[in-house]
Amino acid sequence: MTDLHTDVERYLRYLSVERQLSPITLLNYQRQLEAIINFASENGLQSWQQCDVTMVRNFAVRSRRKGLGAASLALRLSALRSFFDWLVSQNELKANPAKGVSAPKAPRHLPKNIDVDDMNRLLDIDINDPLAVRDRAMLEVMYGAGLRLSELVGLDIKHLDLESGEVWVMGKGSKERRLPIGRNAVAWIEHWLDLRNLFGSEDDALFLSKLGKRISARNVQKRFAEWGIKQGLNNHVHPHKLRHSFATHMLESSGDLRGVQELLGHANLSTTQIYTHLDFQHLASVYDAAHPRAKRGK
């Protein structure tokens, strides 16, 4: 066994005995560190004292070229940094050569939006069951206002202004937003309110479970997924996909990025731009159509 292996074995014993990590976590550390052992051995290293920041960077590049994803590489480098920190604490190394070496950011995977035709099919649900009426109202509100799931389940009856077709929501950072919800959502909320007392009247929540309590986020996720299957949609339906679809459809129709930002409750415009997968060409076309200085003289 080489010094490279010996030090790793000592570190794993430390994690097991001193840190009392689970067997699964220990196995993950072992796999990550075996990868660097193999790379170090291939490059002629006999001990970890010979490892420098250049070798760690080369190891990261090699891992990426072999198909390791950004998130997995981040975990691998994290394990390596922890190992080298331990070697420093044992006076085996003077400094951590992996410090400052980071993996590229993992790409942000956004949910695909539901197109307008599929959305209409999703909303055209059988309403013979009072719970189906509730679900239809939730779907209409979620898609009609682009709410976050937490905002939907947090709605109370007092947050409604059905006469003006608006709803008050408490977003991230305890920031309130007053949002239009559309006439379809208003109609289905009214329909649900006519049936709501069948499940209870003491709770202030707008949307109740069949037990008469505020509906949970998990229950909403489950019901939306079930309706997606029942209505024959190919893609899994979850609440965030409705919010994403709202943003995409609003932006396609209006081109008003700032307005969509306000509706979504994003603090930064850049978040909205990424969220709605805008590209530069679309932004340029919005600018050319709207900005006075963009209009070319004849």
Swiss-Prot record:
Instruction: Write out the annotated subcellular location.
Output: Cytoplasm
GO BP annotations of the record are: cell division; chromosome segregation; DNA transposition
Q: Which UniProt keywords apply?
A: Cell cycle, Cell division, Chromosome partition, Cytoplasm, DNA integration, DNA recombination, DNA-binding
The UniProt activity regulation field reads:
FtsK may regulate the catalytic switch between XerC and XerD in the heterotetrameric complex during the two steps of the recombination process.
GO MF terms held by the record: DNA binding; tyrosine-based site-specific recombinase activity
Coiled coil ranges = none
**Pfam families attached to this UniProt entry:** Phage_int_SAM_1 (PF02899), Phage_integrase (PF00589)
KW Cytoplasm (keyword) present: yes
Under the heading PROSITE patterns, the entry gives:
CB (PS51900), TYR_RECOMBINASE (PS51898)
Q: May I have one GO cellular component term?
A: cytoplasm
Q: What domain of life is recorded for the organism?
A: Bacteria
What Gene3D superfamilies does the database record attribute to this sequence? 1.10.150.130, Intergrase catalytic core
- Answer yes or no on keyword Chloroplast: no
Domain Tyr recombinase residues, every copy: 109-288
Identify the residues that the record assigns to the Core-binding (CB) domain, covering every copy: 2-88
Q: Where is the active site?
A: 148, 172, 240, 243, 266, 275
Q: Note the PANTHER family from the entry.
A: PHAGE INTEGRASE-RELATED, TYROSINE RECOMBINASE XERC
* Similarity section: Belongs to the 'phage' integrase family. XerC subfamily.
Free-text function comment from the UniProt entry:
Site-specific tyrosine recombinase, which acts by catalyzing the cutting and rejoining of the recombining DNA molecules. Binds cooperatively to specific DNA consensus sequences that are separated from XerD binding sites by a short central region, forming the heterotetrameric XerC-XerD complex that recombines DNA substrates. The complex is essential to convert dimers of the bacterial chromosome into monomers to permit their segregation at cell division. It also contributes to the segregational stability of plasmids. In the complex XerC specifically exchanges the top DNA strands.
Outline the subunit composition: Forms a cyclic heterotetrameric complex composed of two molecules of XerC and two molecules of XerD, in which XerC interacts with XerD via its C-terminal region, XerD interacts with XerC via its C-terminal region and so on.
This chain's protein is named Tyrosine recombinase XerC
Task: Give the source lineage, highest ranks first.
Answer: Bacteria, Pseudomonadati, Pseudomonadota, Gammaproteobacteria, Enterobacterales
User: Gene of origin?
Assistant: xerC
